[in-house]
Amino acid sequence: MAHRDIDQALAWANDEIHHPTRDWHELCLSFCRSSYGLPPVAPSAIDLWHKIPHHHKHHGPAEAAPRGAFVYFDYPGAGHVTLKARHTLISTDYCHPGKVC
């Protein structure tokens, strides 16, 4: 899997909205890392959040996250992660189970 820069990652993620390559149900972390062409590094969004060094974490509203950032949410169970676009979040399962929006 080739690594992608921010523009390429967001383009790939936007393509998944209109031309999905798979069902992304409960695969938010897989979707986000796939957008950048990254290999698996943790079994869930919450596990990856806990692996990130404190000095690399930015707490605050999702709107303040930089473009291309992973935005984490403390949902019950595995947590949730989305990808920050310019003015919105690209997420799995938000609009419909398994879909990207």
Task: Indicate where each model-derived feature is located.
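N-terminal capping segments
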Residues: 1-54, 80
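...with weaker cross-activation on analogous glycine-rich loops/strands in unrelated enzymes
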Residues: 41-101
